[in-house]
Amino acid sequence: MAPYNAFVRGANTFIMTSQERHEARFQRRKAKRLERKQARCNSLGPMNKVFSYRKMFFYGKKCCNGVRWKQSVQNFEGHLFSGTATRRRTVLEQTWKPKSCSHFTLRERGKIRPIDAPHITDRQIHKTLCNEVLIPLYSPSMIYDNGASQKGKGLHWQFKRIKQQLGWHYRRYGREGAVLLLDLKGFFPNASHALLYQRHRELILNPELQNLADTVIQYSPCPTPGRGMPLGVEPSQQEMVALPSKIDQWIKCQARVHCAGHYMDDYYAFFPTVDEAKLMGHEIVRRFEAAGIRVNKRKCKVIPLTKPFRFCKARFTLTETGKIKVNGSRDGVKRARRKLKLFHREFKEGKRSFFDIEQYMECQSAYYRNFNDHGRLLRLRRLYHAIFFGGAKCIGSSKTEPTLA
């Protein structure tokens, strides 16, 4: 009988070393992964099936939802039958080129964000590409705890997931250990186009679909040649949410960090000891920088679980009994109080309707109802009723007329 590391083929016996057996297993795994990738690409079908008239018309209708008040959207929807056929022909002939985006800036919580809004005709192609190509091919390589820009997930889903992982950690280690927080620097502006093209070659095996995905990146507005993805473009969101997937897989599978995840460019991970968190933090930062993804080292922190920590503007506290408290942004209450006083002055001057003020108050209430912030919400509503109703009892605002005093 041949030894355990020997293969008998006919009259010949091949003796393999340990290194050769490891290499053979690696090649078999690699071949199976490539076979699965090819099967996923084949399941999409050819170019004319992916960009069929029916699918493009369906996603063209979805592009109009919520923005039908715009004149450009009304013109687009009015000529959707003929326009879809024209745009489909350019895509199949590989002559489609995106139009220039409308550039504007937003100030979000004091931070200026440049936004590039694509033309609605390009949004139809972007939405078809994302839903029919990028999402089916990118999702299998993404970890479950990546909660940004995915159907069925979101920011509050990520908060619930953190609470579940904190509970898992508490049942095994109590309040011992620490949380590692990392932030990627200029995630969208510093994205390397070479990394995105490489992902297309690895995951999009259809040459026509790969060329279309490359075209979207090639014509994306970016201040630095070969670097940067715009905010406000749907393929840009899908590309960036899946960009760090290799490092995510290393953290979860090879480093075996059970409680870890991220929301776009904000990372967190729970460890049994502070030293382990620091050691793993240095290794993760090294791997990000080796991959060409910048890390904001100023925002990288290791916080003991006996202290509260902040993630995506929310404050998490693990108590001694194991209860997990989640509080919303404290700065939001300060802004809301200032705005209510400003709105009252504008309301007395006739510059703002009371309906707008009610809508703003409902938005603030809806935000803080998602957290353990009953006290903050109660104090904010007391201020609201004291300003607009002269300290009247807290009853339905729609049944009570505001005072001008």
Where are these regions (language model features)?
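Right-hand nucleic-acid polymerase module
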Residues: M1-A31, P118, R123, K127, ...
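Non-catalytic, polymerase-adjacent accessory regions of viral genome-replication enzymes
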Residues: M1-A85, E401-A405
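Active-site-proximal segment of RNA-dependent polymerases
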Residues: S43-P46, C130-P189
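Reverse-transcriptase-like RNA-dependent polymerase core
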Residues: R87-K111, E208-P221
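Short Gly/Ser/Thr- and Asp/Glu-enriched loop/turn motifs at secondary-structure junctions
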Residues: C101, G261-D265, K297-R298
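Conserved pre-motif C helix in the palm subdomain of viral-like polymerases
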Residues: I112-I143, P225-K252
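Conserved polymerase palm-domain catalytic core
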Residues: Q165-M264, Y268-E283, R287, I303, ...
